């Protein structure tokens, strides 16, 4: 099933505009859709007690690029309690470019929002001053409207840049307004800047390519072992499917 034919392209899914912007912009850069195994590309399921079963939908969509992108994938979830857009671009390691990471989660009582250029090397080895200044300016503008969430632990923070947008919002009308307007604007600005940098980058030497490969492996292994979405996914789809999804699709190239 094409993701365009699913609920995730419809206005009643919280993150539909974000997903459409992703897919449309990646297609402009001649990215090619990657075939996802059918058991992960679309799944309908139920969760909850026998007396109050709820429906949940999951779709996984991915693309590659012949030179620039190893794998870019979106995982979308829709249910009465949870609505998730998780997106990651894994760049080719012949370019010194960070990951592009998105994690927008609607929980029963709140929203968790993360948007960043996530480093695969130390910040000083991957971000020049011009990029850092641009990111921090965009971040500060976003957080002039969206509250900044609590400080991340050092173990988690090492996988984020100084430009990370990180917010928690209550489920209320004001939050819907902020997501529809400020967050969507910031999301477009971040993605546009990222794709511009990725597609203008020059190839790096073999030694740096090895460092980038090791850095990506380190990040993906950490995410695979410590994915904070694991409990939610397990409650919706069961442990066996969740572990298979994490291992085979979410954090692999």
From Swiss-Prot:
Any one GO biological process: phytochromobilin biosynthetic process
Coiled coil spans: none
Keywords recorded for this protein, A-Z: Oxidoreductase
Annotated family: Belongs to the HY2 family.
EC number: 1.3.7.3
InterPro entries for the chain: Ferredoxin-dep_bilin_Rdtase (IPR009249), Phycoerythrobilin_Fdx_Rdtase (IPR022827)
NCBIfam families: PRK13248.1
Function description: Catalyzes the two-electron reduction of the C2 and C3(1) diene system of 15,16-dihydrobiliverdin.
First-level EC class: oxidoreductase
Molecular function in Gene Ontology: cobalt ion binding; phycoerythrobilin:ferredoxin oxidoreductase activity
Protein name: Phycoerythrobilin:ferredoxin oxidoreductase
Catalytic activity reported: (3Z)-phycoerythrobilin + oxidized 2[4Fe-4S]-[ferredoxin] = 15,16-dihydrobiliverdin + reduced 2[4Fe-4S]-[ferredoxin] + 2 H(+)
Keyword Chaperone: no
